[in-house]
Amino acid sequence: MDPDTVARLLHLNRRFYQTFGDEFSQTRQRLQPGVRRILEALDPQARLLDLGCGNGQLAVYLVEKGFYGEYIGVDSSAALLNEARKKIPNSANAALIQADLAAPDWDQALSGRQFDVVLAFAVLHHLPGESLRRRLLEKARALLDRQGRFIHSQWQFLNSPRLRARLQPWQKAGIQEADVDPGDYLLDWRRGGHGLRYVHHFTGAELQALATATGFHILETFYSDGETGDLGLYQVWKAT
């Protein structure tokens, strides 16, 4: 994907979250079953980095379940981080950092840190182009302890007829279909107004190739979420 298209897709998603951040957060007041499954298996004293932490619901859930390790959340949205600060108990060993995960220096504030677990739920599918995804994964790998785990989820929206009906032609965003990659889609948003956002639909083969290219191997894969239990693809990776 050429740099201009990458920049336009990133701008599209930034504008979406700036415009519909409050409405989006209202739809994310409960964690998905797959996320809860992952969190319930975590060591309660782990050093945890949560990429794309959003409104802090994950951190609140951890505290309620007795987590007493270190939690650091990273997100680009000031509005969502402000909401997270209001939610997370002051007693929690938690810190929040505003940084754009698409930027080359998003990890600057974490220099020299090591984590037992890096989480990236619903993050990679909003990053356009393989090179941008690889860069994030390489940085995540560098932040992991030697025995650490990278755990992520990918939205499998094509498994839902309702969501498939929300797909929009690229022309609505002023982008040509020939300029995007296979698996790239434009979805609409209808809560509190009409918006558009970019999402990539990952296949298992794509994720395997990404893991291999960035020095990981896949330990576990499972599907969860939605009425049919297959709207989220979850994986646990370990550095090779």
Language-model region placement:
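Conserved class I S-adenosyl-L-methionine
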Residues: 1-43, 45-52, 57, 61
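Class I SAM-dependent methyltransferase SAM/SAH-binding core
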Residues: 55-106
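A conserved beta-strand element that flanks and buttresses the S-adenosyl-L-methionine
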Residues: 119
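A short glycine-rich, Lys/Arg-flanked "PGG" loop and its adjoining helix->strand segment in the class I
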Residues: 134-146
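SAM-dependent methyltransferase
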Residues: 151-210, 220
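Conserved S-adenosyl-L-methionine
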Residues: 216-226
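Core SAM-dependent methyltransferase catalytic element
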Residues: 224-240
